[in-house]
Structures are given as structure tokens and as C-alpha cells.
Curated annotation (Swiss-Prot):
Annotated GO MF terms: membrane insertase activity
Cell compartments where the protein resides: Cell membrane
Recorded name of the encoding gene: yidC
Transmembrane segments: 39-59, 112-132, 150-170, 222-242, 247-267, 270-290, 325-345
Membrane topology, as annotated: Multi-pass membrane protein
Subunit details: Interacts with the Sec translocase complex via SecD. Specifically interacts with transmembrane segments of nascent integral membrane proteins during membrane integration.
Organism: Mycoplasma genitalium (strain ATCC 33530 / DSM 19775 / NCTC 10195 / G37) (Mycoplasmoides genitalium)
Any one of the GO CC terms: plasma membrane
Protein name: Membrane protein insertase YidC
Family: Belongs to the OXA1/ALB3/YidC family. Type 1 subfamily.
Keyword Transport recorded: yes
Function: Required for the insertion and/or proper folding and/or complex formation of integral membrane proteins into the membrane. Involved in integration of membrane proteins that insert both dependently and independently of the Sec translocase complex, as well as at least some lipoproteins. Aids folding of multispanning membrane proteins.
Amino acid sequence: MPIKLAQTNKEIKTTFNPFWSAAVVNEKNNWKNFKKFSAIFIKVIKVFIFIFLTIVGLWGCTQTLAQPWTGTNQVLGSGLEIGYKFGTTGDYRYDLISNNFGPYFTFSDYTLAYGPFYGWFVWPAAQIVLPIMYATRVPLGSGVELGFNMILSLIVLLLLVRLITIVITLNSTLALEKMNEVQGKLAEINAKYKGAIDLQSKRNRQLEIMSLYKKHNIKSSAAFVQVFVTLPIFLIIYRIVTTLRPIKAIILFNFWDLSKVPLTEIFSNFTTTGWPFIIFLVIVLPVQFLSQKLPQVWASKRNENAKAHSQKSIEQLNKTKKMQLIFYFVFAAITAFSAAGVGVYWFLNALFTLLQSYLTHVFIVKRREKRKQNYSKLDLILERE
């Protein structure tokens, strides 16, 4: 009798829910639908963010041509300035006051009167830099202000920006690494359809490349995303270093007036205040160049065994190098023709780029070594079996 009862219980357990399979299928379908909806929702959010940043970024670029108050004037007390209300600190370097020469526009409280770019981006970033500079300043009459407070505040701002964008930067770098790793297979696909001019062959080639990218989870837009995010950040910090009153008042190390334009000073006042800016450019420009060159060198070392063999891939690589060279000359021109404060920002930003690129390089190398060790362990297990 107990045996029969146990058998009956077993049968009841196995046949308790006749709709169990259907429930599992429905649950899986619901999960798939949820994943599809989530993916679509995330894409829509990304598109919205990109459109928003594009509009605001273009606004920030073009409003200088449309609005007179956005024209930066590096003379203290002229143009648009961000600082404290007159009489707040009693320090002329921080309190907003006109020099009575030309138009003057004060930005001491939050407002959208100067446009969304200034209100939503420049103002919040300035509220990080301004209090740090004031708290670490050399008080009037207590000594010479060498500008260490400005360097500290920009380092804090750049660190916060890097922490916010590190996920985007790392994903972009890893995506480019994956693209380098599959260059050999990509070269095989290109060689397979070499010389093919019919529409079907071109379509098949494109489908195979898309399949390869999908298999390795590669997004070809990764590099574009990084550039897209970097440009608005540059515009924000550019506006800060050209409109923040205490930065305009600084003579860095009692040697470089950050309100001056290096190239203008070199050609206009070479014997007095101009020649120090030659040293300034000699320091800043090579560091900018290294911040672009060294990451390429590290990437080449990582991908020595994964280089492309197709002529088309080599041509694409050469185009990339040319574009990077063009960018370098553009940045060099901006440094030479903008206020020296912009050059200080580029210098610090280049140092951050070098540090982040090196840490990313070490991370990728260690991750690859770990993968190799795991593969080696798996091979040993398979051999034993």
C-alpha cells in the first residue's frame, strides 16, 4: 500500500499542471518582448539625447555670431563675465564690475537670458570652478597669485567630466579593439568579393560584414559617439575659461597672462610679454600631440597579430591617421589663436587623456591575458577527458 501511494504521489507531481509547457513558452515570449521593447526604448532615448546635444551644441557655436553679448572679450571687465555680484567678496578678481570700455554683461545668478547652452551647461560647470578658485586663492595683499587655484579647479572639473564619460570612452575603445581583432576576417570577406561589381555581390559582402560585426557585438558608430560627446564638453570648458572673471585676471606663474592670445602677443609684443608665449606653445603643443600619438602606439602593440591585410582596410587606416593629423593642427590653431586659458585646459586635458589611455591599455592587455589563461585551462581539461 505505501508503495502504491508513493507511485500515486509521483504521478500527481509530474502531471499536476498540464499547462506548464505553455506557461513557460508564454513567459519566454513575454521576456523576449520586454527585451525588444527595452532595446527600442533605449535607442529612442539615445537618439533624443543626441538630437538635444546637437541642437544645444550648435546653439552654443553659432550664438556668438548672432548675439553681441556672447562675443568673448578677454579684457577684464568687458564682454560677458561669470563671477560674484559686485560687493560680495571685495576682491576685484571675483566681483563683477565693468571697466567702462565697451559692452559689459554680468552672469552672477542662474538665468536662461544668455541661452540654454550657457544656462544648462556653462553655468553649472562654472559653479564647480568658481568656488574652488575662490576658496584656494591668495588673498589680496597676501602675496602673488600664481594660478595654482585655477589649475586645481580645472583638474577637479576634468576629473568629474572623465568620470561621467568614462563608460562611453571605455565602450568606444573596446569597440575599436574588437574591430581591430576582426580585421583579418574582414580582409577575407573583402578579398572574397574583390572585383565584384554586380549589385548582389555588393549586398552579400555588406551582409557578411554586418553578420561579422553582430557576431562579435561590434558597433561601427562607437568612435562617432566619443567625438560627439567630446565636442560639447570642449565648448563648455572653452566658454568657462574665456568668460570666468578670475581666470581672466590670472597671470599664470607670474609669467603668462591667461587673458592674452599667444600668437597675437608673440607678433605684437615679442620683446616684452610676447616671447614667454613661445615657451607656452612649446610646452602645450607637444603634449597635445603625444595625447593623440601614444594611444595609437599602444593600440598597435596590442593588435600586432590582428592587422588588416586588405588594401581597402589599409586605405581606411591611412584616412584615419590623416584625420587625426588634421584634428591636431585644428587644436594647435585653437591654442595659438585663443586666450591662453584655453591652452592650459588643452594641456591638462591631454594629460588626462594620456593617463586614461594608458590605464585602458593596461586593462585590455590584462583582460586578454586572463582570456588566454582560461582558454589554456579549458584545453588542459579537454585533453584529460
